[in-house]
Amino acid sequence: MKFKIKVYNLICILLFINHKSIKMKKLLNLFLVFCMSFSYAQQRMYVGLHYVTVKNQDAQAHIDSEKKYFSKLHKQAIDNGSKIGWDMWRLENPRYGEPHTTFVYAHLEDPEDLYNYSGGDEIFSESELGMARERWGERVVKSGSVMTSYKGGFVPAANQDPPKFVVLDWMMVSPLDYYEYEQTELKTFLPLQKANKIVKGWGLHKIVSPRNNNTEAASYIVARFFDSMPDIYNMMDQTNPMSKTMKATYKNILSLRKIKRSHVLSLVLSER
């Protein structure tokens, strides 16, 4: 990958120096197409979401364990180049009177290097890590996971922590409408979200985990990032007049997808 980047930079310099040449202009056009393709390929990423529920009285112990042990293992995998990033989030909108706390782990992975990480022996002893894992399992009441493919959006730089809050909208979409739905989100709603100063990040993710023929399961997740909970309230509170064009745009997206559920999450830990 480093070799590819060096070649990429060298060609850019040569094209800049010779930009007045007609032949080089033609070559530049071809190269720009290559650059766009290269940039798109570099964005390909899987995001695995791991939902873990513990009793409310065990929530802080669970956070402490993640901070002391497992976040360091993920950081090691990131430094080794076998993982892109890892975040731990807390579900902020559970059911009323819920006696449990749900955490959501986001594993940012390279599709071509999926699950290709191990280690930890040089950080912790085998017995210490084994005990931490055992206690981790004892606290967990239930868990589940889903794998998603990042389709596009705008997010913080790879070496930056994400904003403090995220809203995950789980979308039900007919397989017949997958392509049109993706294009509508990426070409129409992505620019709108990017122009909204309250929204600090936005991403479209397609669920790639098998759904066991469940026609009521969500097919996509739209993630919207914010700096604070008041910013989320402010966004939800906005009621603006719509032009005929905007009404038609929203009617189109509403015909393509249905929101199954929404999760509001707050950031607990992050490793990059």
Feature map (PLM): residue ranges:
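Bacterial Sec-dependent N-terminal signal peptides
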Residues: M1-R44
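Short S/T/G/P-rich N-terminal loop/turn motif that feeds into the first structured element of a domain
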Residues: A41-E126, E134-R272
